[in-house]
């Protein structure tokens, strides 16, 4: 650090530290969600051929296998959730969202859509606070995937809105469709998390613990 200061590289060091932190936070988020989207898209492409016979005739069956291998090669989604959850609970993603909401848009046509996403950020913050308030690690683990999906939905929406403000002819429709999907998922997950209590975990256990006979 002394060498950095002596050469006047303080700003470079700060930027490097910032982007290293962002890369650490976004890598598990991007890997997990992209593999899930790839799987869903490939699965949907197979579904449209339903009833036509031998699926091996279509390239989509190969793409579906590739998508499955991709998700395993990059680490299963659950492993990516484990890697990302600390950035959820410590507020890293929330800070990024709020910073993105304050950024300038190239086109006013996206302001209304961003206001809708701002409401989702509020719900997300409430959901994170609810989970953080619990000292039960099982609850943290159980609800982590929903928080992970909410994180990806909101950040994906904000990135798409930013692109749409620069090139509305290319991304405006996609932004509206994606935000609508994000609203459905974030609102639903928030309701689920807020209503969840520690005793609810018992309902999800496959095998009940054997009670000792008196």
Regions found by a protein language model. Give the residues of each.
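Generic anion/oxyanion-binding catalytic loop in active/binding sites
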Residues: 2, 23, 146
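Single conserved hydrophobic/aromatic residue that forms the stacking wall/gate
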Residues: 2-13
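Short glycine/serine- and small hydrophobic-enriched flexible loop segments
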Residues: 4, 43, 83-87, 158-163
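Alpha-helix capping/hinge segments and adjacent helical runs
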Residues: 17, 21-101, 176, 180-214
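C-terminal amphipathic alpha-helical interaction region
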Residues: 91, 103-214
